[in-house]
Every structure is written in C-alpha cells, then in structure tokens.
Amino acid sequence: MSDGTLFTDLKERKLIRTIVPRGLVRSLKLDVKLADPSDAQQLYEREFPLRKYPTFVGPHDEWTLTEAMAIDYYLIHLSSDKEAVRQLLGPEGDFKTRADILRWESLSNSDFLNEVCEVFFPLIGVKPYNATEFKAARENVDTIVSLYEKRLKKQQYLVCDDHETLADLISAAAFSLGFISFFDETWRSKHPEVTRWFNRVIKSRFFEGEFESFKMCETEMQPIK
C-alpha cells in the first residue's frame, strides 16, 4: 500500500516550495505517489481549499498535510534510511543542531523567499513595478544574503560543515529563483561563498531530478515597467 500522495506542480514545475519534497520522494525511494492537482481535481479542491501546494494526502485519503516544511519533515521520516534521516534533520537528541537547521529552513522559506518574490514578480510582469517597493525588496534580499555569506565563509554548509542538511536544501531551492533572474555574473562575483555553496548543494543526491538542466542568468533581468 502506498504511503500517500504528494500533490506538486509536475507539469510546469515553477513553484519553489515544491522542489525539495519532490526530490526527497525520488532520492529516498519513498512509496509516495507524485500527482499534479489537475489529475485529481475534485479531491484536491475538497481537501485543500486554499489551492496551494505542495500538499500531502495519506493512505486512503484519511488525513492531509499542508505547508512545505511540515511535508518535508514527514517525508524524511517515511524513509527507512536512518543515516539519511540523521543527516537531513540532525542527530536525535541534538536539539542545538536541530534548532539551527530549523532556523535556516524558516528564514529561507519565509522572509528570504518572500523578498526574492517581491523582486522577481515585477521582472516577469506578475506584479506591477513600483520603484520604492522594488528597491526595498532588493535591499532586504541583500541583507539576508549577507547572513548566508557570513556563515558560509566559516563552513561549507549552513549547519554541519561536512554535509548538507534540510536547511541547505530548502535554502538552495529559494536561492534558485534569484540565480535564474537577478543573481547575475556581477552579483555572483561579489558573493563567492553563497555561489560556491549553491553550486555544491544543487548536486546533492536529495535533489534527484530537479537541477540537472539548471542554468544561471548571465545578466540581471529588468523589471517590466
């Protein structure tokens, strides 16, 4: 019996928060079905009225789960690979490491990604360009990036120096939106630690099927005015 169904944007694959859970299902060889909401529209709309994803439905549709970080955590615990669980979430009982992982997950999945989107949306015409708001968002992105750059000058990954954790995966997924749009060659030359870290993390086995054809932007996209 399947352990459940992960609803994700299989057809367009544009949503940042769906990257990590898809990669976890594939890399951990989980008995979880990947489905696009359009393939089970009645179930999806009934169980998830906000119509956001990723979302998860357990066996026999008896329970549901929303919010990317919660889904990532649950999927990891479905794995029989105890070493992978320890690597991604930190050792059991090591609350300092686990809290640090959660700290970076939360920062990247909320404040950072929200500000990156505030820059990205005017670049593709999803949101009207407002010079004041755009400038403020860029400054907020720069402030948060400086925290990553500072940490990554000291170690290879955000929490554990010798391996990636879930914090790195969620953070790299969020950074990918910047790297395809406005983290251009000039920006990357000014942020060498973040750039090296990102290139290392997207090669992680836990991102199976996600970044094989990824290309960074050469020049910064300009807002549509």
From Swiss-Prot:
PROSITE patterns: GST_CTER. Residues 94-225 form the GST C-terminal domain. Pfam families: GST_C, GST_N. GO terms for cellular component: cytoplasm; nucleus. It comes from the Eukaryota. One of its GO terms (biological process) is translational elongation. This is Putative elongation factor 1 gamma homolog. It comes from Saccharomyces cerevisiae (strain ATCC 204508 / S288c) (Baker's yeast).
